[in-house]
């Protein structure tokens, strides 16, 4: 089976995180979001991957190359001008000779793609749209289907009066190669606005599949922050690049945590992190690789990129800090996004408290000392050495 990943978006709603980075390359636990998508494909034995590119394409090509590091074969299709979500597939027709999956390189999901593909083939579908239940469907496409799952009607971004379901189109599709014949050459073309209406008009076998698991399109700064929190609680299954030493606790290698440090799960501490005397790491906090937290500093409900530094006595709450940000001593940050642009002020944005309520408390949340966490990490290392 083959896959096409759409990775040409600019990600304007994620500014300033996307000021120098294409949206699919924004970090999620020290890996680009796009890398998590590739890992998902590999878990489902999909090794032949084509990535469509536009904005800052060179960053993606330089990072992933031919895909050998991830055990997949990656090809690239560069769009000189915007081709819409479906327009770029026409160029790929010669290489797409079997059922293939289309997904977005800036969404996070753990859907069972094998189950969706089996459903697609069982129904002899030409196209299958994966659906997911959300609280507010107004920003997505909604679908009406018959009892057998065949799509009858599709409404993109419905008005409030048009909403009849909270199950939405995720932008993940299982397609047969024949569907490409509906896409014109070298023209912008969209799945929702153009292709799907044509399939309905021609009464093609176009089905939907209600997927189980997790999906988020990472369409806002608040959603970006909360995807991290969802991973810490296990709502989404990701391959995190650190050791899980206890429930809700991930710790990387070469970590220095002073015995007086207080840590409250769930949290993630990357490789080479250093936490100094009497500092604290509250619930739902992520420390990127090589971050430092000085004496008496406190962090909670925040995501810190690699190489960040939190000064003595500073407090960071509900914030996202890009790689390399240095917070001076005694500062207080709340619901802010900071990205290094080479200036002393950095690029800044406010981040809403959207979705924070579901992460305000955790069942069985314990406070750990730095000494206890260090012991857990050491024990796990010893067990792995014995197993080897």
Where are these regions (language model features)?
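N-terminal glycine-rich phosphate-binding loop and ensuing alpha1 helix
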Residues: 1-61, 72, 388
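Phosphate- and divalent-cation-binding pockets in alpha/beta enzyme and binding domains
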Residues: 13, 59-62, 91, 112, ...
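A structural signal for short hydrophobic beta-strand segments in well-ordered beta-sheet cores
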Residues: 25, 142-145, 196, 208
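Short internal beta-strands
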Residues: 50-54, 130-131, 303, 320
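Conserved beta-loop-beta/alpha segment of the NTase-like Rossmann-fold superfamily
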Residues: 61-62, 67-147
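Catalytic-core segments of class I nucleotidyltransferases/pyrophosphorylases
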Residues: 100-101, 108, 114-121, 135-137, ...
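Structural signal for interior beta-strand "rungs" in well-ordered beta-sheet cores
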Residues: 243-375
């Amino acid at each position: 089976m083959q896959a096409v990943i759409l990775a040409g978006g600019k990600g304007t709603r994620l500014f300033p995180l996307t000021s120098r980075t294409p949206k699919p390359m924004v970090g999620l636990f020290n890996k680009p979001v796009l890398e998590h998508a590739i890992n998902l494909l590999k878990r489902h034995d999909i090794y032949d991957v084509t990535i469509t590119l536009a904005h800052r394409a060179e960053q993606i090509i330089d990072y992933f190359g031919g895909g050998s590091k991830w055990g997949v074969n990656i090809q690239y299709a560069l769009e000189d001008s915007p081709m819409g979500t479906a327009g770029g597939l026409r160029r790929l027709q010669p290489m797409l000779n079997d059922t293939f999956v289309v997904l977005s390189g800036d969404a996070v999901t753990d859907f069972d793609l094998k189950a969706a593909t089996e459903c697609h083939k069982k129904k002899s579908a030409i196209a299958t749209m994966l659906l997911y239940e959300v609280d507010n469907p107004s920003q997505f496409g909604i679908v009406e289907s018959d009892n057998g799952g065949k799509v009858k009607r599709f409404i993109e971004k419905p008005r409030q009066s048009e909403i009849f379901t909270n199950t939405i189109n995720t932008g993940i599709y299982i397609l047969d190669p024949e569907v490409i014949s509906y896409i014109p050459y070298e023209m912008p073309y969209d799945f929702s606005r153009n292709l799907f209406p044509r399939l309905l008009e021609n009464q093609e076998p176009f089905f939907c599949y209600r997927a189980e698991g997790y999906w988020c399109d990472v369409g806002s700064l608040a959603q970006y922050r909360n995807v991290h929190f969802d991973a810490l609680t296990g709502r989404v299954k990701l391959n995190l690049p650190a050791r899980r030493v206890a429930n809700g606790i991930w710790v990387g290698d070469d970590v220095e945590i002073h015995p007086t440090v207080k840590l409250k799960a769930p949290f993630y501490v990357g490789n080479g992190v250093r936490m100094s005397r009497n500092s604290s790491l509250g619930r739902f906090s992520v420390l990127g690789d090589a971050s430092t937290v000085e004496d008496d500093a406190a962090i909670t409900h925040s995501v810190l990129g690699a190489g960040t530094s939190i000064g003595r006595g500073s407090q960071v709450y509900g914030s996202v800090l890009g790689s390399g940000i240095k917070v001076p001593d005694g500062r207080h940050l709340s619901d802010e996004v900071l990205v290094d642009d080479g200036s002393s002020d950095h690029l800044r944005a406010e981040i809403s408290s959207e979705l924070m309520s579901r992460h305000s408390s955790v069942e069985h949340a314990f406070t750990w000392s730095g000494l206890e966490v260090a012991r857990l990490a050491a024990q796990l290392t010893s067990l792995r050495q014995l197993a080897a």
